[in-house]
Amino acid sequence: MIADNSKDFDLKSFLANLTTHSGVYRMLDKHGEIIYVGKAKNLKNRVNSYFSKGAKDSKTLMMVEQVARIEITIAPSDYEAYLLENNLIKQHRPKYNILFKDDKSYPYLVISRDKFPRVSFYRGKSAYKKGQCFGPYVSISSVKNTLNIIQKIFPIRQCENSYYKSRVRPCLQYQIKRCLAPCVGLVSQEQYDEQLAILKKFLAGKFSSVLEEISAKMYQASEDMEYEKAQVYRDQLVILRKLQQQQIVDIQEDKTFDVIGIYMQDSYASIALLQIQNGDVVADRHWSIDAKGQDKTSIMHAFLSHFYLGDEIRNIWPKNIILSKVEFADITDLMNSISQKIGQAINWIVAPAADNLKWLKLAEVNARQKLNIYTSSKSQYQKRLESLKEFLELEKDIKRIECFDISHFQGEATIASCVVYTDEGEDRKSHRRYNIKDIKAGDDYAAIHQAVSRRVSSGLEADNLPDVMIIDGGKGQIHQAEAVFREYGIQDKVQLVSLGKGVERISGKEKIYKGFDDTEYTLDEHNPGFLLLRQVRDSAHDHAIKGQRKKVSANRQSSIIEEIEGVGPKRRKALIMYFGGWQELSRAFVDEIAKVKGISNKLAQEIWECFH
């Protein structure tokens, strides 16, 4: 059970004694869950406004009714307050805040910390751990395009460390002058670092400076009669100037724009972000959100904070930002905080004209198109949820569905997958897999029993059981889940249902069984609820197959090494520690394997032969 956190909190006294400093406030419900995070210049005035008389939208009224406790944090500046607010929203995702769902993390270009660093791209919040980051980039295609350009200009390695360490002669990239071959010692540390320094300036957007520096180095090398070196610099200049003419690289730094368009309809909103360089759209991204009770200004405020302040390692910034028409005074403080983070002023364009207006209209058209697709898809999904609710004869709306599927390879490497769907759609971040242990090979019934038991046990502890649990299988599988439900006494808390292929084993002809009901049900193959059941089941099946294949692959590679005489647990561990995994080991050459402590040249040869 979750404790009631409202008992010792005196709201009236708290409001009366609030500070007038700037800071962040958090509103919590009776369970201690943060339901809203806000930032205020004057905490006393802002927080009290929620509880004073006056016109409020229905969403705010509903939120205030649930407030059982308020916590505050005083911030030394508006900038610090915005950062804290953003971090708390990302961490807790309060249900009454405007939330932006990013299906994937932004990609970064990363220069590694190796002696001879490699340049690559990495997606994720921990990109900074890999090395020096440049970004974020809006899309994978834009970061890959930049990598291709880099490879043509700067002969910095892009290969994986395992490949780099195993080289005994230069690869093709050296032959076509796209790498300096540090792997085999064909370049000095000083020469490599020089190219690396110019590359970093290039990635930081200092293109004019890069041109000047390379040009100066070319003339200096020529004067020193280092003609081969001068030729390298000349080739770099030729490519850079060609790119400049093609407007692939933005040499005129003041011609970079971010354009943010918002389109609202009913209780939904869509935000389109276009990135413009020299008159071309080079990247775009979209967000669609539930905007009930919000206006365009509050959505713009939330988005600017999310996109520009929410990423601690961002170091690529536009010179100009064009915005949809909003109440400028309400976002001025946020604009100043963003400029403070950058360390320089941004040109905010809130009343665009001419070409700038053309870009804004394009962004708003994109936002409208994406919202139409989003609302259509959402409407279809809601119809499926309602249909499933009706079929299962549930009183309450379905908020969370989980589905289990079992996968194994000839009885081995058994995996149970659990996929999650909410009332918003598939929740990929909540998907998980269970390694099934201590059962008879190929025993799907025992596997279902174990997986469901583990999920129910953790769900009761965390108070996050689903409304509906789907089992991929027929009567035998659902009976195993029923046994678990009886054991934990949750027969009336979670609706159990299974989807079996039946005798015909044809998609669309599946048999449906409800928990603790021996009746065999069938639905029309176009029934919305039936379509949802199959959609969730198929997702669970795919998730299980992927996990099972990974496990089989890992087991196979591990067993290959185990068969080699002289490679025991200690040496296997040493190999994995050195290469980072079986896949990297399989790519290594004999001389590289022999570098591992305890591995002789003869043993290294045997290990190499196992993989080839």
Curated annotation (Swiss-Prot):
GO biological process, one term: SOS response
Coiled coil: none
Domain of life: Bacteria
Entry annotated with the keyword Cytoplasm: yes
Pfam families assigned: GIY-YIG, HHH_5, UVR, UvrC_RNaseH, UvrC_RNaseH_dom
SMART domains: GIYc (SM00465)
UVR domain boundaries: 208-243
Family according to the record: Belongs to the UvrC family.
Protein name per the record: UvrABC system protein C
Organism ancestry: Bacteria, Pseudomonadati, Pseudomonadota, Gammaproteobacteria, Thiotrichales
Annotated gene: uvrC
